[in-house]
């Protein structure tokens, strides 16, 4: 199988400022499973430190004119921290408006965010929030599904909910490390659904990293996981990002 082109997420360097993490784009970023990572598209993420201001994104675009940057999840765009997921879209209007301004300044082709908490919205409401968010951002906005957690806290954290997302007509991102947690928790590997979701042209991003099936540890992929053969079905328009931590390796 030909391995896919995998792009850099600044989640590879958590805890650094956005501009500090971006300095790594000037050097080759290599992973054991995916080889040299591509920098045509790069995610700006909440794992990095500090406020992502207009001036900072202008500096990033000037320093790396060949890179198409895009925002992911609740990256910090305001001085105050906001846990802004799609389920809570109405409660975080200020954050979403500022994120949309930053995204438009980047001329970003897409934005992806987590589905969020059940306490904030029903599945149908969250999907409608995603459509409204796309209108605000002026680009494609995709829902990133989640995984089982205590108290059944997260939307899109079961196989039936992933099926419903797939059938909704709304764009989405597939985080394969989240699906690994779901598979370990449920005892089910729904390869057919994962294949179909990856192949669909509404899959705008695919996120890869490794974990032990119990937590979203964002480790670098070193060995082929169960979903490795399914990568061949990724539709050519989807951008694949590695979110593996290049700063430190988690020990058991």
Functional labels for PLM-detected ranges:
Residues 1-97:
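N-terminal pre-domain/capping segments
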